[in-house]
Amino acid sequence: MSLSIGMVAGEPSGDLLAGRIIGGLRAGAPDVHCAGIGGPQMQAQGFEAWHPMHALTVFGYIDALKRIPSLLSIYGQTKQRMLAERPAAFVGIDAPDFNLRLELQLRQAGIPTVHFVGPSIWAWRYERIHKIRAAVSHMLVLFPFEEEIYQKEGIPVTYVGHPLAGVIPMRPDRAAARLRLNLDVGERVLAILPGSRSSEIRTLAPRFLQAAQLLQARDPALCCVVPMVNPQRRAEFEQILAQYPVQGLRCITAEDVQGNGATPVAWSVMEAADAVLVASGTATLETALYKRPMVISYVLTPWMRRIMAWKSGQQRPYLPWVGLPNVLLKDFAVPELLQDDATPEKLAEAAWTALTDKDNAARIEARFTAMHEELLRDTPALAAKAILEVAHGAG
C-alpha cells in the first residue's frame, strides 16, 4: 500500500520547492503518492493536481477581493477531499493565508500537518505564532534564526537550509556573467533592481533612476543595468525611464542573455555587477549569495502603510532589520534606506560607497560567503526525512 501525502503550493516558488521535496520523498519512500494543489514542477515528479496552482495566485488586495468566491470554493473542495482521503500527512508550502487555515482543519481531524517556509513573523504580526502552534504539527524553515524562534515557542521545527544556496555558485564568475550580457569586463557596473511587481516599479524606479543620475554625475562612465522579469514589466519601467533618463542604461530581459537560459536574468545581472541597488525581498538574498555589495530600499504607499499598520498592530517589527542578509547576519551589514530615507541623494551616496570601497566589498564578500555556507544544506533530503517521520507518527 502506497504512502499518501497531501500537498498545497500556491505560487511558482512553492512549486519549485515542493517539486524537489517530492523527489526527496521518493528517494526515501519510492511508493509515495502526493496529491492536492500544485504546479508543473510538482507534476513532473508524479504529483496528482486536483486544482492547478495558478488557481490560488492573486495579485494584490483588489484581486484577492475579486477572487474570494473562487478561493473559498477551492478551499472547501480541497478540505473535503483531504478529509475523505486522509493522507498520512499534509504539507503546506508557503501560501500561509490558505494553508494555515487548511492545516488547522486537518490537524483537528487527526491528520498531522507540516508547513514548509515559515511566515515572516519575525518581521511583522508575531501574534500569528498562536495560529501556527494550533495548526502545524511540524515546521520546516529556510533560515537558522527561524529555528530558534519556533524552538522557543515549543513548536517542533527542522531547519532545512535554503534551496537557493545549492543553486547559486559559491564562487560567482563576474567575467563570465559580463560576457553573457555583452558588458565590458573593465567597466564599473551598477545593477538596479526596483522590484518585480508593477506597484514596486512605480514607487521605486523614479528614486533609483534619480540616484543613478547623481552617480553618473560623479562617474560618467558608470554602466547601469536593469533586469526585467518579462516584456510587460520592461515596458512599464521604460515609461518611467523616459521621465528620468540615465545615459547608456541597459534594460535586460531573458532574451538579451547569451546562453544560460535556465538562469533568471536578474542572477546574471547580479553576478556581473560591482554593486546592486535593490528592492527589499528575495532579490536581496540572491544578491548576497552572489557576494555583491548592495543598498536595500523599500517604500510603501501611504495606503499600504495604513493597511500594514492595521494588520500588524506593531509600531516596530520583531527584528530591527528588514533586508534578509542583515536579518541573517544580525547586523546592518549593508545599508537599508526605507520609506522617507529612500531619497535619491541618500541612495546615491550609499551606492557610491558600495561601488568604490574595495575594503568594504572584501568584508561583505567574506560575510556573505560564510552565510552561504550556513544556508547550504541538502534541503530535499532533510525536508523529506522530517515529513516521513511526521507521516509515520515519529515527528
UniProtKB/Swiss-Prot annotation:
SUPFAM superfamilies per record: UDP-Glycosyltransferase/glycogen phosphorylase
Gene that produces this protein: lpxB
GO cellular component: membrane
Role, per record: Condensation of UDP-2,3-diacylglucosamine and 2,3-diacylglucosamine-1-phosphate to form lipid A disaccharide, a precursor of lipid A, a phosphorylated glycolipid that anchors the lipopolysaccharide to the outer membrane of the cell.
UniProt xrefs under HAMAP family: LpxB
Organism: Bordetella avium (strain 197N)
Family: Belongs to the LpxB family.
Reaction equations catalysed: a lipid X + a UDP-2-N,3-O-bis[(3R)-3-hydroxyacyl]-alpha-D-glucosamine = a lipid A disaccharide + UDP + H(+)
GO function terms (MF aspect): lipid-A-disaccharide synthase activity; phospholipid binding
EC number: 2.4.1.182
InterPro entries: Glyco_trans_19
Gene Ontology biological-process annotations: lipid A biosynthetic process
Signal peptide: none
Alphabetical list of PANTHER family matching this protein: LIPID-A-DISACCHARIDE SYNTHASE, LIPID-A-DISACCHARIDE SYNTHASE, MITOCHONDRIAL-RELATED
Protein name: Lipid-A-disaccharide synthase
Keyword tags: Glycosyltransferase, Lipid A biosynthesis, Lipid biosynthesis, Lipid metabolism, Transferase
TM annotation in the entry: none
Pathway the protein contributes to: Bacterial outer membrane biogenesis; LPS lipid A biosynthesis
